[in-house]
Design a protein with these regions (language model features):
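Sec-dependent N-terminal signal peptides
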Residues: 3-14
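Asp-box/BNR beta-propeller blade signature and adjacent active/binding-site loops
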Residues: 16-346
Length: 346
């Protein structure tokens, strides 16, 4: 009988293990060799929109913003909705699209244009019909970049809080937030957040806690995910502090679930000692937390090494309670994964 114990335990563990309900490539036959920085939003129950940038290579002038709609259980062919052509004829790359569906009003697509992250500026377009058609591009006010990688959130009073950051310049990597109460017509800059000891952070992702506090988790080039907290609805933020979670200098994203748990998608790997600012973007994992402090690994999405890894996740919970994730797959494709959070247990 003893010889049956281990196989039975393995079988039971396999039965309990969470598995994605859907795992598929969105842009299987893309007309460009490289893509990155996906974002996803639910525009109506059962209707999703995803966006990313694609072109010959990140930073090249031909890199544009592509959008795909998901209806009737399948992804439509992606279309090019924004480029970096300027009135004077110059053409710059586009970067880091971020979709945001407000409680009311059109779908918003924020993105960046410019020769490099240290020199880019914020842009936005809107769609009144769930991503089918788009407005002409609009430049954000000087100094306003919009959400830099991760989704904006709606505060209880209806204001949009955009998690943002800057790279380069005299301030280096700094996290800040941008607030608008009139759908992007006027803006308030909050921050930058105090850097804390030995932490260079960008690309925050905002979480809501039951006690009313807000939390942001941030990418760093210091080997760990950083965190900052707000006790007053996002108007002021604590100095950045290191978490116990590793970060190989790669984007993360997180979402507060309807049941109050916090869900994080991240690369569970630290940079090697001889390359402290750059690590492997593999594996790609999911963790859960009740308090935003103690995190528990619950699922590995990708673990097979590949040249360019799996990175820059975007995660939402849709009206049906499911978790939807999109992310870069080896810089060649955008992958879409669906999870049932009820199956995710430490």
């Amino acid at each position: 009988m003893k010889t049956l114990v281990l196989p039975l335990l393995i079988l039971a563990a396999s039965a309990w293990a969470a598995e994605p309900q859907v795992a598929e490539i969105i842009n299987e036959h893309a007309p460009y060799p490289e893509c990155h920085a996906a974002t996803i939003a639910e525009v109506a129950p059962g209707h999703l929109v995803a966006a990313w940038f694609g072109g010959t290579r990140e930073g090249n002038p031909d890199v544009c913003i592509w959008v795909a709609r998901h209806e009737d259980g399948r992804w439509m062919e992606a279309v090019n909705v924004a480029g970096g052509r300027q009135p004077d004829g110059n053409r710059y790359p586009t970067w880091n699209p971020v979709l945001f569906q407000p409680r009311s009003g059109p779908l918003v697509l924020f993105y960046k244009v410019g020769p490099a992250p240290s020199q880019w500026w914020g842009m936005m377009v809107t769609s009144p019909d769930g991503g089918r058609t788009w407005s002409p591009p609009q430049k954000l006010p000087d100094g306003v970049l919009g959400p830099i990688k991760n989704k904006s959130v709606t505060l209880p009073d209806g204001a949009w809080l955009c998690p943002s950051s800057t790279e380069g310049g005299p301030g280096g990597w700094r996290v800040h937030f941008e607030l608008t109460r009139d759908a992007g017509r006027t803006w308030k800059i909050i921050g930058p957040v105090e850097a804390g000891p030995n932490l260079d952070a960008i690309q925050p992702s905002v979480l809501f806690h039951r006690d009313g506090r807000l939390q942001a988790l941030c990418r760093t080039r210091n080997g760990v995910i950083a965190t900052t907290w707000s006790n007053d609805g996002g108007m002021h933020w604590s100095a950045l502090a290191a978490t116990t979670l590793p970060n190989p200098n790669s984007g993360i994203d997180a979402v507060t679930l309807a049941d109050g748990r916090q869900l994080l998608v991240y690369n569970d790997s630290a940079p090697p000692p001889d390359q402290p600012t750059k690590g492997m973007r593999c594996p790609l994992d999911v963790a859960l937390s009740d308090d935003g402090v103690a995190w528990h690994h619950v699922l590995t999405l990708e673990s097979k090494p590949c040249p360019n890894g799996y990175a820059y996740p975007s995660v939402i919970q849709t009206a049906d309670g499911l978790v939807r994730i999109v992310y870069t797959w080896n810089r060649q494709h955008i992958k879409y994964v669906v999870l049932d959070p009820r199956d995710l247990k430490p």
